Amino acid sequence: MFFDVLGYENSQSSIKINLDLLETNIINIFILIIILIYLGRKFLGNILINRQNRVITSIRESEERLEKSTIRLNEAKNQLSSAQIIINQIKQEAKNTAANVKESILKQGKTDIERLLLNTKNYIYNTELQIKKQIKQQIAALALQKVQSKLKDELDNNIQQKIIDQSLAMLTIRNK
């Protein structure tokens, strides 16, 4: 059947080409193709133009989105680098602050130790003074007791009276 349209004849022994244009309908097929091209050209042309316009619009929108995305990406990179700079500054400030705090604590500790040493030295000095004073008082008390006991043993009433009179005379002379 297909071969009939093209003008081929099937015989038992050979294939023959039918050159009669009217029998093979080649003219009709050719006319049909021309009509389809003429009428379909507008229809297919409009479809293809619409499709082309949609593709071009999609490409433009994609390019615009790409540009916007690239701009946002660059902004994000700039923000990231700014954030990294700020983070590095914060780290450096933290190191400096830690060093300053450490130095301050060491100075304060040294000052506290010096103050404690001074307080301890003062306490020891004052304690020594009190102990010396107590020792002197005890020595004086013991000396007085010893002198009193010696005087009681060696002095009689007349000598005691003379000493008292001399002491009173000296006091009266001083008071005048």
Swiss-Prot record:
Per the annotation, which location comes first and is thus the protein's main one?
plastid
Please list the coiled coil stretches. Answer: none
Q: Which GO terms describe its cellular component?
A: chloroplast thylakoid membrane; proton-transporting ATP synthase complex
Q: Which residues cross the membrane?
A: 19-39
Pfam families named in the record: ATP-synt_B
**Which membrane topology term applies here?**
Single-pass membrane protein
For this UniProt entry, the molecular function terms from Gene Ontology, in alphabetical order, are: ATP binding; proton-transporting ATP synthase activity, rotational mechanism
Annotated family: Belongs to the ATPase B chain family.
Q: What does this protein do?
A: F(1)F(0) ATP synthase produces ATP from ADP in the presence of a proton or sodium gradient. F-type ATPases consist of two structural domains, F(1) containing the extramembraneous catalytic core and F(0) containing the membrane proton channel, linked together by a central stalk and a peripheral stalk. During catalysis, ATP synthesis in the catalytic domain of F(1) is coupled via a rotary mechanism of the central stalk subunits to proton translocation. Component of the F(0) channel, it forms part of the peripheral stalk, linking F(1) to F(0).
Q: What is this protein called?
A: ATP synthase subunit b, chloroplastic
Annotated organism of origin: Galdieria sulphuraria (Red alga)
